[in-house]
Amino acid sequence: MSKNSFSSMANSVTSFFQSLTTPNRHADPSFRPSRREKQSRLPTPLQSVAASAYSGVNASQTGLLNDSRANSVTNLPNSSNTSQVGLNNISPAPVGYVPGSKTNELANNSMEMQEISPNGSASLPPPVSESWRRIDRWAEENYYELYCQLCYGATVADVDSLEYELECTLPRDVRESLYIHDGQDRGGQPTGILFGVTLLDIEEIEEESELWRRVAQSYAEATLAGKIDQAVASRQASFPPGAVQCVYAHPGWIPLAKDFVGNNIAIDLAPGPAGQWGQVILFGRDQDTKYVVARSWADFLAIVAYDMENGKWLVDEDDNSLRLIYGPPREQWSYLDILKYRARKAERRKFKKRDGKRTTRPIPKSIAKEDVTNSANSTAPSTGTTVLDDGLDNNYEDIPLYGPSKDEELIKKEELEADTDLGLINTSEINQPANLPDEPTAETSNPVSATTVEAVTTTADNKDEEKNDHVTEDVSQNSTIAEASSLQAQEEEKEIETTSVKQE
């Protein structure tokens, strides 16, 4: 027996006995969150691009290649209450992440409140447990095989070990989600609980994150060496602009679900200047534009629960995959495409609310879209920067991203394929009143053919003849009545005269 075979057998036996003695699904019973053996590769905690050493494609330094940090107190801003001598006497002490700190934070009830929303509106998402309760209930009633694929929840040690391997701090809602369902078993089918997108367990999250971190490492090295394909680099974008770092892959993107064709639903632990820590994004092989599809993982689960309860779903007969019915008839959009469309629609609603104007008639697509910057700096009398009507009434304006998402009208396919579809248009010519002439002229009026004139004239003559016939009949009837009345009067006069003669 070879050494590798013996080692594999020993690991299997050890795993079997561990499964009998510990509730952990992934972590070893001997795992201690306080131990720290790996060399950190990322600034800790992962921050936005404004505070991170990783600055994208044109970076001169990157956290992937240079692990320099600025965590010592000597780099703090100068303050009037702090003496420079005191700072020099303090030795630099880098602040590192200790796995399990999130667990201790939860136990001490010192967790910070999650941010309400990017625009400051008081619209908190439902609790993660409530969203999963709705998803479980729907799956058990409508697709029991898919419900059985959902795994049991992970333990605290499992989640702590995941943070240890990834060297990051996971958002609270992600931890809570893993405590409820630690991914799903595929069962040999490409069926995902997220409308065809499979939920990953802790082990798969580690493997997928490691894979994409190697891709990000290669991408960063090629960028610094000047060997990156400029066509690929120029296609990397963010929606909304500035919310996600415009790179192909980033070590701060933690995949939580994937479609097994190279695309992922992930949480962003290193957002752009306009982004939010813990936001849910799409990235991968077909996602050059990185879309923000939810403010947090709790928001995203609420969206999924709503879509399931909405009733517009079907099970594909070929691969038994769950699909959401959305878009034109006879076309099946992937759930990732639907999420991207909704992100654009939410951005349009934001522009509508900001400008306070909307169009009430369909706009030809041939009209050029108006640039946001130019419209904001324009000094011309503005009819306003208006947006395409998306079929939603005014009651939907203040609904958060996880609210009602039904769109009763058909979605145009060409709108989905647009690169940056904010619905912005140039209405300077459309909204101006038309210059109508006072009187119709021969040039503007439509010419009438001779045949038409003759037909109209003949019809009019026929009507006049019929009218004259009716008048003649009426006159003759009146004459007959008058003659009868005259004869009757004459006879009465004769009778009166005869009576008077007899009396005399």
Swiss-Prot record:
Top-level taxon: Eukaryota
Pfam family, one: SMI1_KNR4
Lineage: Eukaryota, Fungi, Dikarya, Ascomycota, Taphrinomycotina
InterPro entries cross-referenced by the UniProt entry: Knr4/Smi1, Knr4/Smi1-like_dom, Knr4/Smi1-like_sf, KNR4/SMI1_regulator
A Gene Ontology BP annotation from the UniProt entry: cell wall organization
Record field: compositional bias (Low complexity): 448-460
Alphabetical keyword list: Cell cycle, Cell division, Cell wall biogenesis/degradation, DNA-binding, Mitosis, Nucleus, Phosphoprotein, Transcription, Transcription regulation
UniProt feature, compositional bias: Basic and acidic residues: 25-40, 461-473
Biased composition annotated in UniProt, kind: Polar residues: 68-91, 373-386, 425-434
Record localization: Nucleus
Cellular component terms per the entry's GO annotation: cell division site; intracellular vesicle; nucleus
MF GO annotations: DNA binding; protein-macromolecule adaptor activity
Family: Belongs to the KNR4/SMI1 family.
Compositionally biased spans, kind Basic residues: 349-360
Function: Protein involved in the regulation of cell wall assembly and 1,3-beta-glucan synthesis, possibly through the transcriptional regulation of cell wall glucan and chitin synthesis. Involved in cellular response to nitrogen starvation and required for quiescence-maintenance by regulating negatively G0 to G1 transition.
Gene3D superfamilies from the UniProt entry: SMI1/KNR4-like
Region Disordered: start-end pairs: 17-45, 68-98, 349-403, 422-504
Record's keyword annotation contains Transcription regulation: yes
The protein's name: Cell wall biosynthesis/cell cycle regulator smi1
Positions where Phosphoserine occurs in the chain: S500
